[in-house]
Amino acid sequence: MPRKGPAPSRPLVNDPVYGSQLVTQLVNKVLLDGKKSIAERIVYGALEQARDKTGTDPVVTLKRAMDNVKPALEVRSRRVGGATYQVPVEVRPDRSTTLALRWLVTFSRARREKTMVERLANEILDASNGLGASVKRREDTHKMAEANRAFAHYRW
């Protein structure tokens, strides 16, 4: 266990193209093997495709998708006596953003379109319309929290 405490969080720079921290976070989530230029190409291409298909600002579309994917509740394991309970807890805003971005990228990679640009663009568009696997993941998370509501008094 480190004695210094948690590492301080560094400030995120705004994205050079769209001027948005959210786009910077998305680029960092798409990033594989340190190849940032490729990650930027994928994200910018996906946002351009989203602009072409909707005719609106892609950052607004991305924010709408994020609002539809961000979880409000999740379950965490808590051991009480000999039993492990799934205790529903509220999700902190920074964690909900991180989870939403992670789910968007993960389910984009699992899609069947030909290129990652198309996959990410279509997942963002689906999520902004309340469809897609990432929105389903959020609903499943909320259902799980609702089903385990009886254990909410074990919150810490």
From Swiss-Prot:
Provide the assembly information. Answer: Part of the 30S ribosomal subunit. Contacts proteins S9 and S11.
Keywords, in A-Z order = Ribonucleoprotein, Ribosomal protein, RNA-binding, rRNA-binding, tRNA-binding
Family assignment from sequence similarity:
Belongs to the universal ribosomal protein uS7 family.
User: For this chain's UniProt record, which GO biological process terms are given?
Assistant: translation
Instruction: List the lineage, top down.
Output: Bacteria, Bacillati, Actinomycetota, Actinomycetes, Mycobacteriales
Stated role = One of the primary rRNA binding proteins, it binds directly to 16S rRNA where it nucleates assembly of the head domain of the 30S subunit. Is located at the subunit interface close to the decoding center, probably blocks exit of the E-site tRNA.
Q: What is this protein called?
A: Small ribosomal subunit protein uS7
One GO MF term attached to the UniProt entry: structural constituent of ribosome
Q: What are the GO cellular component annotations? A: small ribosomal subunit
Keyword match Transcription: no
Could you tell me which InterPro entries the record lists for this protein?
Answer: Ribosomal_uS7, Ribosomal_uS7_bac/org-type, Ribosomal_uS7_CS, Ribosomal_uS7_dom, Ribosomal_uS7_dom_sf
State whether keyword Phosphoprotein applies.
Answer: no
Q: List the disulfide bonds.
A: none
PROSITE patterns per UniProt: RIBOSOMAL_S7
Q: Which PANTHER family match?
A: RIBOSOMAL PROTEIN S7
Species for this entry: Mycobacteroides abscessus (strain ATCC 19977 / DSM 44196 / CCUG 20993 / CIP 104536 / JCM 13569 / NCTC 13031 / TMC 1543 / L948)
- Per the UniProt record, one Pfam family is Ribosomal_S7
